Amino acid sequence: MRIYNCSYCGRPIPPGYGIMYVRVDGVVLRFCSRRCFVSMVKMGKNPQKQAWVRKIRRAKSAAQSKSSSK
């Protein structure tokens, strides 16, 4: 089983969860929640400008740096 990352916030998506959206040009976007899906597809928001996305990405990078330093 493969674990994908959310195209909007970067969270891991466990198998059997999330939304897979295929654009007309063939690009596959995977979302962990409806919140991410609506923010990107329906409202066209930029994830870099969303405070909650920045918070998730910072926590993810901090966890990765701790695990790589061991």
Curated annotation (Swiss-Prot):
One of its GO terms (biological process) is translation. A zinc finger (C4-type) spans 6-36. SMART domains: TRASH (SM00746). Transmembrane segments: none annotated. GO terms for molecular function: rRNA binding; structural constituent of ribosome; zinc ion binding. Belongs to the eukaryotic ribosomal protein eL24 family. This is Large ribosomal subunit protein eL24. It comes from Caldivirga maquilingensis (strain ATCC 700844 / DSM 13496 / JCM 10307 / IC-167).
